[in-house]
């Protein structure tokens, strides 16, 4: 039987490609796990990750932002009392239509005010949406203190981001 060098080269190339893909896929799952555990460090020093281990869609990064004409502007974790509108921006790991997202604004520590929920905003994603934001507007100055936004994905608490009004 005569071996053709072209077929031999093609077979070796195929074996190398398959070996690289297997190695790459194994490394991706490990790097995703390490990225998930570091998400709070990437997005802000004041966010925390509480998602279920088997979550298909999750918040990859989360940030608070100042208002810029009704849209999220500069990223921040500190507002002035006169900043009437605060935005929370969640970047999802992937776009999946029908993902239910809930933003829950809470008072953490404000002098003379009981801790608790301020408001809730719910949204269901459309196709190709992996960035979702919600905002909260107050008609008067914000009381100084600390606040947080909890972000739920499909009913499960995923991430929390803290901010202050100073």
Per-region residue spans from a language model:
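Sec-dependent bacterial lipoprotein signal peptides
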Residues: 1-18
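Ser/Thr-rich, Proline-interspersed low-complexity disordered segments
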Residues: 20, 46-54
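Bacterial lipoprotein signal-peptidase II cleavage site
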Residues: 20-38
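Low-complexity, intrinsically disordered segments with a bias for serine/threonine
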Residues: 35-38, 44-48
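Contiguous segments within soluble domain cores/interaction surfaces
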Residues: 51-144, 150-163
